[in-house]
Structures are given as C-alpha cells and as structure tokens.
Amino acid sequence: MPGGVEGENSRMTSPLRPEDPTRVGDYDLVARIGKGGQGVVYLGKAPDGTRVAVKVMETSWASNSRARSRFAKEIEAASKVAPFCTAALLDSDINADPPYIVSEYIEGPSLRDAVLRDGPRTGAALDRLAISTATALVAIHQAGVIHRDFKPANVLLGPDGPRVIDFGIARHSEATVTATDSIVGTPAYMAPEQVEGRELTPAVDIFAWAGVMVFAATGQSPFHDETLPAIINRVLHQPPRLDGVDERLRPLLEACLAKDRSAAPPRCRSSVSSSATTR
C-alpha cells in the first residue's frame, strides 16, 4: 500500500518498514497508521478480510515487565468502555511475542489532522463535536476509567461520529497514583494537578476536553507555546488563550480551564454531562 492519504476523509498510513512484522496472531499487517511511546499501530486485515487497527508492542519494550503491565491495563480500560464512543476492542494477546491489541478500524481522520488540513470548526459542526466528545467522556468515566491523554490526535472523526481512542495511559478511577505513572499525558492538554503529579480524578479529562474544543475552534491549544517549560508555565500560571472561541462556548470552556481546580471541576462536570444528555 503506498504512503499518503487513502482518501480525503481517511486516516493517514505509510508503508511497512523492513523491521516491521507482517503478521501477528491471525492478522496480516499491511501499513503503518502511527507510533506511540511503546508500540506501533498498524492497519491490519482479519481472516475474514475486515480491516482492523493492530497495536503491537515494540520488541525493545516487550521484555519490560512494567511496559507489559501498562499494555495489559490499556486492554482492561478499553474493554470497559462502551463501544459507541471508542474503537471497539476485538482481540488481544498480552502473552504473545510481541503483545498486541486489535481494535475496530475507524475510517476517518483524527481531529488534529482534520483541523490542520481543513481549518477550525465553527457553528453547528463545533457544537456537534463538543456534545459528542462530551458524551464519550461521560461514558468513559461511567465505566470507571480516566483517560489521562485526551487530545486532538486521540479523537477520530468516524463516519458515525467522533470516537475516543488510545487508552495506553488510562487507568481505573480508584487506582492509586504512584511516582512512576503520575506525570503522564500531553502537556498542552494536561490539567495543573496532572502536571504537578497530584491525585487525579475525571476532572483532568474535562480540562483536556475544554482544551481540545479550543483547538477545534481556533487551531491551537489554549496553552500553546514554543517550548515545553513555557507550555507548563502557561498551564500552571497563565490564563488560557480563548481568542476566536465562539461566545456561546467560551464561558463553559473558561470555567473548565480555571486554575482554581477545587471550584471548577464540579461545575464543569455538571455542564458537560448536561450537554451530553442533550445529544
């Protein structure tokens, strides 16, 4: 399969590299979709010809017990979430060499790619995106899962609506935070308590949701800057940049991105949940 976009509304793929596997389990791997911290996501084919997304742990991580444990937690988290809001988990083998996860293949670009290609969302399109992604997060939280890395690249714009993907650093909402896993995520969309390594609640996903909606409306995160230290400083100490955000959404997003985390999350969770139920 040649590199590039398969179609105007498809996900970007690239050819397999010489070091890539061509088959794992019962699945043929035909192209690369993307690469994460510990694994590569491939476009695959099931025995019946159905296209699937196959995440394969890189061999350099496969012998790391902590990495395998995180991979297993990703499988557990994805299996708990209602399939309407994510790419449904189809198969997995944590004991394979290397371990892999097979998910439903969503035909459509990520929100990040779509905004960079077509420009920001406005009007009804932005409203639909806000409500549908809020609905997905409510369902994820109802399953007892905190995503912890909600960002534009992890929202796929499928033909039947947005899907939230990549539960690689998600965990159960009652799990204990440890020093080794507390500070993970994408800085421009991380809540202050996540940056500081404090105890996490579903509120961190609501903060990220607001940041993603700002990106969808403007093409940039509300804490965009040139360097990682500058981004973190903005998250912790500077107000979000909301220029260009629709006035109807702005008060809610501003509240969700507030530095006073003790007051903002309950109000935002209530507002986001209310928005979701109006879908």
Language-model features: where?
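Eukaryotic protein kinase
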Residues: 2-279
